[in-house]
């Protein structure tokens, strides 16, 4: 039997205490029925001299970790889609985990027309999360997202080009937990002369990706811990989500953003970790 570290033990104890506190303090109803539907739109401006003038004001919307289930439903997804379209994005990216349990979910076909309603002139891109590969869901995810109008990436690369010839780069890595991420084969294609965006589900990929010319990494996976304690932060974070847990970080010239996601897994609770849609606006400083 694998021994538990002191830190893991303490986190488990805090988790049990927090669950008890939520129940005893009447916070359970808030964490179960209110906060999971309090979707925040977070806005960030990304500045770089590598961003061409033609891409100044270019708007990217990220959503992540829908975990469609009985707890985050199709009605919730409709609200998300309306919110995203109202922001008038140029590009939409989904950073993994569309369905909580792909092998048991009963409404795959109903998801497709909702995803088709998302509009962005430069397209809709998505990557795999661990739940998309899990439960024999790899092919299901690709079929569903493609039918919904998304380009599905696994260790992919492309450039976005304007009529004036200006470009930015987008790369993606397969899921770290259940996929086969190809760091060198994918990221060696990036140029240090172009502004680059990396899509990867697990944020701690940045421990390796900052060795490459990545300017902006967009990730999800952690749900912001899903349950946080004041002055302590997330009680439990998943594998590959221990270092970067939520929000914006900067390491050298790389900005790393960890979206808190939309749905829930394991426990149908969110506390001090509201679901999130993120809007990024590119700003040229050249």
Curated annotation (Swiss-Prot):
Keywords: Hydrolase, Metal-binding, Signal. It holds the Pfam family Metallophos. It comes from the Bacteria. A divalent metal cation 2 binds at residues 97, 130, 221. Binds 2 divalent metal cations. Its cofactor is a divalent metal cation. Gene3D superfamilies: 3.60.21.10. Residues 1-31 form the signal peptide. The keyword Flavoprotein does not apply. GO terms for molecular function: metal ion binding; UDP-2,3-diacylglucosamine hydrolase activity. A divalent metal cation 1 binds at residues 65, 67, 97, 223. GO terms for cellular component: membrane. One of its GO terms (biological process) is lipid A biosynthetic process. Predicted to be exported by the Tat system. The position of the signal peptide cleavage has not been experimentally proven. Belongs to the metallophosphoesterase superfamily. This is Uncharacterized metallophosphoesterase YkuE. It comes from Bacillus subtilis (strain 168). The gene is ykuE.
């Amino acid at each position: 039997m694998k021994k538990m570290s002191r830190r893991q033990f303490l986190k488990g104890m805090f988790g049990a205490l927090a669950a008890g506190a939520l129940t005893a303090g009447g916070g359970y109803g808030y964490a179960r029925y209110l906060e999971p539907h309090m979707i925040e739109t977070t806005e960030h401006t990304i500045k770089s001299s590598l961003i061409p003038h033609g891409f100044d004001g270019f708007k990217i919307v990220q959503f992540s970790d829908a975990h469609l289930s009985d707890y985050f439903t199709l009605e919730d997804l409709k609200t998300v889609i309306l919110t995203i379209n109202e922001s008038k994005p140029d590009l939409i990216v989904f950073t993994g985990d569309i369905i909580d349990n792909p092998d048991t979910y009963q409404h795959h076909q109903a998801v497709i027309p909702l995803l088709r309603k998302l509009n962005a002139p430069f397209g809709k891109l998505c990557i795999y999360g661990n739940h998309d590969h899990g439960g024999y869901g790899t092919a299901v995810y690709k079929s569903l997202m493609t039918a919904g109008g998304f380009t599905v990436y696994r260790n992919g690369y492309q450039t976005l080009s304007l009529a004036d010839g200006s470009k930015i780069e987008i790369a993606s890595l397969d899921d770290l937990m259940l996929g086969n991420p190809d760091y060198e084969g994918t990221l060696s294609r990036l140029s240090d002369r172009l502004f680059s965006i990396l899509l990867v589900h697990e944020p701690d990929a940045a421990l390796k990706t900052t060795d490459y010319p990545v300017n902006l990494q967009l990730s999800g996976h952690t749900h912001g811990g899903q349950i946080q304690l004041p002055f302590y932060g997330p009680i439990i974070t998943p594998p590959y989500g221990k270092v970067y847990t939520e929000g914006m970080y900067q390491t050298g010239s790389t900005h790393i953003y960890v979206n808190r996601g939309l749905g829930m897994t394991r426990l149908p609770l969110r506390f001090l970790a509201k679901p999130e849609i993120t809007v990024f606006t590119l700003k040229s400083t050249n």
